[in-house]
Amino acid sequence: MRQASVTLAMLAGFDSLLVQDALAQGKPPMPFRVQIVYSPLYVIDLGGLEKLHPFDIRKYEKIYKQLLLDGKISDQHALVPEPLTRDQFLLIHTEPYLQSLKVRENLIRYLEAPALRLAPVDLEKKIVEPVRLSSGGTLSAARAALEVGIGINLGGGYHHAKPESGEGFCIIADIPIAIRQLQADNRIKRALIVDVDVHQGNGTICCLRDDESTFTFSMHQDSIYPIPKEIGDLDIELQAGCMDDEYNRILEENLRRIMSSFQADIVFIVGGCDTLSGDPLAGLEMTTEGIVTRDALIVASCVEKNIPVVFTLAGGYSSEAWKTQYQSIRHLIDTYGVAK
């Protein structure tokens, strides 16, 4: 197994810089504990038809249950979110798009799931409502992060949803909505999005285009969906076969530069696991260790700068994806502890 250029041992040194850096900024250091956000109602159940879709919708449930089984959290620790309201949805999306989600064929197109034509169920209830809840989970995780430092939504990261349409399995732009709500509440002014899903977050870019209060940083594979790519604030295109060493070196170099020049009040991570070797929809060659290191690097960079951070799960289409994301979340809990 190739050793990631930035190791977990090296990242441990970041914590010692926290108090010094926070005091230099005139802000009290945050506690940086982990708050998990989850509801069993995130799970989409279509009587087995959901298994025909490449996305493992049960990965949220699998990760949560494994955290419980291994004693990393308790049921009492998990924060259960509220679903996004209509007004919150309209902070980013248009009214015509909201109405379009009531039309079966539109949902089938947005989710790229023709098998849903066979589902004898109300798709708005069985799909839109769980996604509305898990999107509310991103807002809940962000609010928690502002209090305890690290909010992890075991869902979310729907980075292909655009103001007027859905695509790429995504129908609600959860991160842009969370940013707009926090800004409306005067909780934040500026937000950084670090998108390390293998696919460019084209929807996020469209939602936040020409917005000086946000910065979109995406590292993604060059020759896969979406084509053509959108133009974000910083886009790093990677070729198929990219491995741990190269990936984390590029990430570290660019992340340090961005965080020095863009003063964010909160950071959102689109933590897709489709960079894992063997993912059927991509061609990068990262290992579980490399992805755990990747996520730890981003969070440690936020801790070093005393910036609250929100983690969302986004994509990951191999049978091992949930296990890798579990290892990453477990490592963050082991490193920072859970919020009390």
Residue ranges and their predicted role:
Residues 6, 15-340:
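HDAC/HDAC-like amidohydrolase catalytic core signature
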